[in-house]
Amino acid sequence: MAAAEMERTTSFDAAEKLKAADAGGGEVDDELEEGEIVEESNDAASYLGKEITVKHPLEHSWTFWFDNPTARSRQIDWGSSLRNVYTFSTVEDFWGAYNNIHHPSKLVMGADFHCFKHKIEPKWEDPICSNGGTWKMSFSKGKSDTSWLYTLLAMIGHQFDHGDEICGAVVNVRVKGEKIALWTKNAANETAQVSIGKQWKQFLDYSDSVGFIFHDDAKRLDRNAKNRYTV
């Protein structure tokens, strides 16, 4: 008999003996079988009833954020409708969340859905994001679901050589289609940013060129901001 099977069998026998003693008001048989360990009844019942679940921790904890601003809130204070949805730190908790949230093709028009490292807010003003920038990919309407998933898996799975440079990712749902952006924290680090852009394209098998815009440029120039790096 295998050691693991033996352990289960002896534990089960011991628990059964305890239950029999409790039911009859009697004492546990003093003559224990070889290798048998008798625990207190509560402990034995707990052992039998416990579901053993092994979880696999991620390199970092991550938080999903949702934003569906109205035109008014955009004008008054960008991010005022941003809300924290769920924080996860294991593979299993990620899938539990992902399988119970709307994917980009099912989100309402104008929505932004973010996944950022825990305690980093998806805002230019966040101190970790403030000196960074974004890589951005465009997709036809309803065609970004798989790429969004692959982006999340590569990001939370620490598949990027410069993964510590990554703050998070966001998918924007708009009338003309969806955009997925990777936010990084040090835009001036060209080596790291170009590496991230190239690997991201490889992970998603994305054939079009993608550009990187500094947050500072985006804040100053808005839609007129130009790509600093292109891959």
Swiss-Prot record:
InterPro entries: TIF_eIF4e-like, TIF_eIF_4E
Any single GO BP term: regulation of translation
Compositional bias (Basic and acidic residues): 1-20
Subcellular location(s) per record: Nucleus; Cytoplasm
Region described as EIF4G-binding: 56-59, 66-102, 150-159
Region described as Disordered: spans on this chain: 1-34
Modifications made to the protein after synthesis: According to the redox status, the Cys-129-Cys-167 disulfide bridge may have a role in regulating protein function by affecting its ability to bind capped mRNA.
Single GO MF descriptor: translation initiation factor activity
Superkingdom of this protein's organism: Eukaryota
Cellular component, GO annotation: cytoplasm; eukaryotic translation initiation factor 4F complex; nucleus
Subunit structure: EIF4F is a multi-subunit complex, the composition of which varies with external and internal environmental conditions. It is composed of at least EIF4A, EIF4E and EIF4G. EIF4E is also known to interact with other partners. In higher plants two isoforms of EIF4F have been identified, named isoform EIF4F and isoform EIF(iso)4F. Isoform EIF4F has subunits p220 and p26, whereas isoform EIF(iso)4F has subunits p82 and p28. (Microbial infection) Interacts with potyvirus viral genome-linked protein (VPg); this interaction is possible in susceptible hosts but impaired in resistant plants.
Family in the record: Belongs to the eukaryotic initiation factor 4E family.
Protein name according to UniProt: Eukaryotic translation initiation factor 4E allele Eva1
UniProt lineage: Eukaryota, Viridiplantae, Streptophyta, Embryophyta, Tracheophyta
